[in-house]
Amino acid sequence: MVSADVIEKLTKVLKPISDEQGANAAVALLLKSKRSDFDVLFVKRVKNPSDPWSGQMALPGGKRESKDASLKDTVLRETLEETGIKLDRYRFLGVLTAVKSEPKPEINILPFVVLLEDEPKLKLNKAELETFIWVPYEEIVQSQGMVEFSFGKVPAFILADAVVWGVTYKILSKIVKAVEEASRK
């Protein structure tokens, strides 16, 4: 269980929103508050041969555009475009350490951690996203394992309704560590 106290302590563990760390893309790690825990939003990307993350579970977000004054602008714009959620009405807790995608294309992604106090109404951009799921944080923590692909075994979160691996796995691993650190404070 993750208490409201831990959420407050999490703000001290995370980096400030202004710390962009040389990133060129941003994602929203959306934590929907519940009484004694939170759920995390995952989206499933549509299958698209030109998308290196085609069909994978992901977090809303994307690349910075020239019109974005900051990566916060990027995550606000991309989350609205993909999910219909207006993040500017929610509380930004901070950012995690940026994560590099691999192998290609190499993108440096800044994960913004955002607390949602209510259930947002989602309107998916069907050109980019197939579906979405909310997953209880405790299920994520308890679901770490390995998954086999044609190219070998990789670490993953094996959830009831999805497998999360790759760059999204790296980001989730960082929030799990941050919550653990906040719990010890």
Please provide the spans of the model-predicted regions.
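N-terminal strand-loop-strand
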Residues: P16-L59
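Buried hydrophobic packing segments
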Residues: L30, T168-I175
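Generic structural signal for well-ordered, non-membrane alpha-helical segments
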Residues: S3, W165-T168
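Gly/Ser/Thr-rich helix-start
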Residues: Q56, G62-K63, V167
